Amino acid sequence: MEGESTESTHNTKVSDSAYSNSCSNSQSQRSGSSKSRLSGSHSSGSSGYGGKPSTQASSSDMAVKRNKDKSRKKKKAKSPAQATAATTTTIKSLEQTEEPLLVKPNNGSCEQQLELQDAQQLGAPTPSDAHDAHGDKPQLDVDEQQDDPQAEQIQQLETATAATISPDTMSASVTVTIDGCTSMEKTCEWTDRPGRLEAHAACIGKQHVQQQQHDRVKEDSFCCVISMHDGVVLFTTANLNEMLGYPREMWLGRSFIDFVHIKDRATFASQITTGIPIAESRCSQSKDARTTFCVMLRRYRGLASGGFGIIGRPVSYAPFRLGLTFREAPEEVQPDGCTLSNATSMLLVISATPIKSCYKEPDEFLSPKGPKFAIQHTAAGIISHVDTAAVSALGYLPQDLIGRSILDFYHHEDLSDIKDIYEKVVKKGQTVGATFCSKPFRFLIQNGCYILLETEWTSFVNPWSRKLEFVVGHHRVFQGPKQCDVFEMSPNVTPNIPEDEQNRNACIKEDILKMMTETVTRPSDTVKQEVSRRCQALASFMETLMDEVARGDLKLDLPHETELTVSERDSVMLGEISPHHDYYDSKSSTETPPSYNQLNYNENLLRFFNSKPVTAPVDTDPPKMDSSYVSSAREDALSPVHGFEGSGGSGSSGNLTTASNVRMSSVTNTSNTGTGTSGGENSASGSSNPLPVNMTLTEILLNKHNDEMEKCMLKKHRESRGRTGDKTKKSVIEKMPEYSGPGHGQTMKRGGSHSWEGDANKPKQQLTLSAVVVAPTVSVSPAEDSQTTAKWQAPMTGSHLFQSSYNFPQSINLWPPFSLGLTTPTVHTTHTSMAQKSFSPQHNLFPAFYYIPAPLATATAGSAAAQTSVSSASAAQHSPKSSENPSTSQPEATAATAMPMPYMAGVMYPHPSLFYAYQPMPFPSVSGAVQMSVQSSGSQSNNNNKSIYTMAPASTTTQKPGAFHSITPAELNKPDAPDTLLHTETSPKISVQEAPKKELSDLPSTSARRGSSSDQRNNSNNPKKYTDSNGNSDDMDGSSFSSFYSSFIKTTDGSESPPDNEKETKVHKLKPIVEHPEEDQTQHGDG
């Protein structure tokens, strides 16, 4: 026996050790003495059995020694009738035993059994034994079921277990004897309440068996209850012997997992772990919720079936379908009133039903009502699910098939038909729920035979991935195998298949797998894909085309500069072509291609041409220009005049901060320093430049000029916008002297914007009082030759010319590189008083353009007004060399009471707001200042349509109001000088240069219209223009013009035609202007 118990192989580990420790004697078997159960030599070592006692429901406060129970029981009084009844009960139990071996009875255990029987039958136990009698289980026999004491004991058991069991429904085969309970009490050391959990397990087992008998009367099964605390068997039914051959007592206290096949233990454990959470949430589950799976349980190897040769016999297993149900033991009440929870005493009720082969005869044909089962496999051919109904037909348990390839079970001769079947499966899978039936094919079963199956196929294609997910075959056995027992092990015989056949079969299997793993395409998908491909191609072509159009020559790709200054951001780009320049990176400013037509003066010129004026060139000789005018004319040709209210795009009224306004002489410059350059170095070069000839402005010439200027404007804009983000203010300032043109510091800005962010709060109308400069002036005489032009012009401070005892060399740069100004209180205090006295136009530097106004109805007959306007051409700039000296001037203003004037065709009028937008800035008179006298140029003809271009003289003794100041009648009545020549006085150290009158008339921006009172009275017959409340003409509202265009427009009486040499020089004048766009650096600004 020791050899059997110590055998290491699993063939003899479980059954033989349990068999060697079992007792055939009913008294010793049922007494469960500690001597027979706890003997170390014959213990099997299995959990909950033999030498490994359980610790379930044991605690220190409930532990009571067994010897005290024996001592109390020995003191009881025994009667012969009670002993006879107990002996009869044990004899009946002995007859039911199945073990042939005999063992000497244990007298102590028999005595204990008798004492317990006496106490239970009396029904009134002693107070000292009441606790023990209440905890023991009663013995129930058929002959004693009607006794009152036993009926009362049954009621107590029902109350303790919360189960309703009627005594008449119990049978002897399912009753639990006292000896079994005491045996478990001894083995598991359940002190204080011996057999309580077993009694509860027994009641649950009896209920389960009764339910099985009620539901499945014809099906044989056994039931067992397992403790989830340690996994031992607490209860099992007697028909266990019929199913597996084990005596019922051999399973008690043994671990259930020892009887499960090794390959099925993982399945059993997984079902337990998944079933426990379901059992714990019983509030939402049915009380008898079951989990069903199949395992192989071990058969018993007894002497009756195999004799005494135990080691050499193989261990056999039988398939069973197990149903799992979880129950929980109720709470127990201790003597002290405390409640002990049995949460750890969760019970597992297993109902085991044997599975038998469904075939009765070899190769039998089954009816359509034959066994049906389903097998599911993936697109890779791996089986993922098998019904439990397939076990009786195939002999495989579900866990035996899951994970294996379905192609391994098909007969090799049927693979061609299987391939056709799967082609149809994939095709039908495109329709959800579509099924089809295939012709029968052979399938391999457990015993190595083949059965013939009729299958209904269905498949599922993922609508998103368009791939086959799984295939389900609903099989029905059409013909059975040659061997009926499907659970027999198949002989390890490999079928003899030729090599070429094997290769062909392998190729067919690969084709089937490839077919199932490929993406499923529908016929309509092909059309959709083609349409989608064409749409994508069209979209790609359109994007490419749009990109090419967007990358045209006029597109400006502006960089995203992160360090733009305030002035750069607020500056007007491209002559203020767009009103959306609030932010430099706005979409409108970066994506709108610049248009030259948006410039204000171009619009006004178009209005001028639309009015269809009668224009003709003057009858005088072709005018000539000196180098200073050439330089200024080139710049003014590109300079847009804007920034007034009502002009297209600016919206700022009166703030003349653009480049063209800088050149409008000293009266409109918004800089704080005076204008003036040191031009002595340029005398030779200036005189040698070819002098362009005035040309008649025509619409064709304007369009040609606009086209050329637009290209230059785009070029300038790209260059100015191509700066990097890390360019600092210092680098910008250093770059400014490279630009040509006067007043380049005053770049093209919006009205109200500042020149630089460093002087954001600097007043716009200030005077620089710190530097009083003695200006070398020019004395002009009519007797000089044309080559002796005046090249020395005086720099001005505060729009004044001064003569002082301080003499400066001609070549010294008298001006700072940038226009800076200082706020001086003197300027503001003397502003009002000296406005009319300390300001006088510098006619020798800034050409004046006189208008002949019509007298008002309320004015006297001899009163008229002559207003002066200064064009944007600055005479201070002589050549590109002198452009390094920024020349600026202080703006002058006139009174608001401007007289209305008649419109004169061909005459360019400045914006009306220029006459009153700026107040004249005073400057204290300096002793010894240059004396200037204005001399009359003679009387004019009565037609008043001819322009006489002369240089305005400097005042001698009296200072007159600004150039835009309205001329009062009192001033007109003053006698004029006898001759029309202009002259100035220079300092003693400066030589006087003279020029003929013909060359002085070459300055196109300078014209003086003077006449007597009779001439002015003749002017009153002219039609009166529409004027506003301020007396301003609305003919050219909201516009100003550059000197380039003002030089074109001349009026005449129409009696003369332009000379031939003027026609010849039209193109020559425009060409040098266009060829030098770089000289006009102030047109587009710095940003």
UniProtKB/Swiss-Prot annotation:
Pfam families: PAS (PF00989), PAS_11 (PF14598). Residues 15-46, 79-93, 665-689, 1028-1047 have a biased composition (Low complexity). GO terms for molecular function: transcription cis-regulatory region binding; transcription corepressor binding. Residues 65-78 have a biased composition (Basic residues). Residues 129-140, 1060-1087 have a biased composition (Basic and acidic residues). InterPro entries: PAS, PAS-like_dom_sf, PAS_fold, Period_circadian_regulator. Essential for biological clock functions. Determines the period length of circadian and ultradian rhythms; an increase in PER dosage leads to shortened circadian rhythms and a decrease leads to lengthened circadian rhythms. Essential for the circadian rhythmicity of locomotor activity, eclosion behavior, and for the rhythmic component of the male courtship song that originates in the thoracic nervous system. The biological cycle depends on the rhythmic formation and nuclear localization of the TIM-PER complex. Light induces the degradation of TIM, which promotes elimination of PER. This is Period circadian protein. It comes from Drosophila virilis (Fruit fly).
